[in-house]
Amino acid sequence: MKLKTTLGLLAGRSSHFILSRLGRGSTLPGKLALQFDKDILQNLAKNYEIVVVTGTNGKTLTTALTVGILKEIYGQVLTNPSGANMITGITTTFLTAKSSKTGKNIAVLEIDEASLSHICDYIQPSLFVITNIFRDQMDRYGEIYTTYNMILDAIRKVPTATVLLNGDSPLFYKPAISNPVQYFGFDLEKGPAQLAHYNTEGILCPECQSILKYELNTYANLGAYICENCGCKRPDLDYRLTELVELTNNRSRFVIDGQEYGIQIGGLYNIYNALAAVAIARY
């Protein structure tokens, strides 16, 4: 091990020890370690199977649900606290990791879209998950396609990684990457094709730029879309929600590929997060 790496580990872990005794959480340990060795994250993460969760909405819940499911299988899963989703926070997470009792090191990381490409210079995820891309964070990152291209640039750095996408989003149709791609989405009863109630993002057909219609529209621009001009339609789903059993303000029950699940939270958008978590666990 190089001297700079040793010093980085010492500085990072010592600061974490002190901060934890003071009852304070911080990304400072990662920041200190990176000042000694800018490549320290690469060394810390090299023996992990890594799942990256990104997107403008739902990252935190998807990550938490995924960690909960995987802990039942493996007992121990490394993850970063909500908000610690840039390189200093990710480095702190690996600095303070405990050794796995099962011998299988798994990390599920929530990563900020704008930081993802830089972080992927130092980690090798086996799975990328994009929850969705909506306009809520566009003040930070510009237009929807700018954010999407930032994420794709990161994914291209790890061409062997599988990419799990929300198949109900037209934005994710045939992404310009060489990676293997899988899709999750709602596979409920379809009706006549009609315009989305609230396509607030103004997403058009990804093939011919015509206005899309929907045989099933869950919310916003998500659902079983179809273009009546060129025939483009939602891709086949690998992980399917096939039934909504219950949906209230504080509870949801649903069926994914024949198995019923429930979460103590309402909202269709949260069911998408749960669907993504189940898909990750089954991957």
Protein language model regions, located:
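Adenine nucleotide phosphate-binding catalytic loops in nucleotide-utilizing enzymes
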Residues: G185-Y283
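Phosphate-binding loop of NTP-binding sites
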Residues: K2-L204
